């Protein structure tokens, strides 16, 4: 239970690498309990999300992150924003702030359905020349990237990843352009 929770980050990554190799080489099935999703994604060939003593999703780490099966799993991972949208075709939705969003639905919804669309930080792309701009209300530097939190006219807060080598770094209160058309490969809706 939380075996690496009190270890310094640099040492923790080294221990994780060694632990993963030992477990793989010795072919030992192990259950590691953690609240650190990155740790679970790195160490686990499978991840289980248990909430309120109930297994909500059991899958490989990629699917748990990119294809969460419930709003509860989305909220637990806390990696994106659920926005209200309307299904306008078998491959598109409309949102009042983002406009048209295209992609491949993981499960079909009837045209006209009101849904909650999961927008992950990597789903939207920065474009200074875009006319779709939102206010930066927070900026977190993470070494290799920034995570900008954008506020839309309807007060949605949307996180967006931008590589840290990007020439124009935005400050809080600046406008931040989102590339159009918006295309999300795996459209996850509830």
Task: Give the predicted meaning of each segment.
Residues 1-72:
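ABC ATPase nucleotide-binding domains
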Residues 80, 91-190:
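Non-catalytic connector elements of ABC transporters
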Residues 53, 59, 78-80, 85, ...:
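Glycine-centered flexibility sites
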Residues 17, 71, 85, 134-135:
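Small-residue-enriched segments and motifs
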Residues 66-90, 118:
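C-terminal boundary and immediately downstream tail of ABC-type ATPase nucleotide-binding domains
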Residues 28-31, 82, 145:
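Secondary-structure boundary/capping residues
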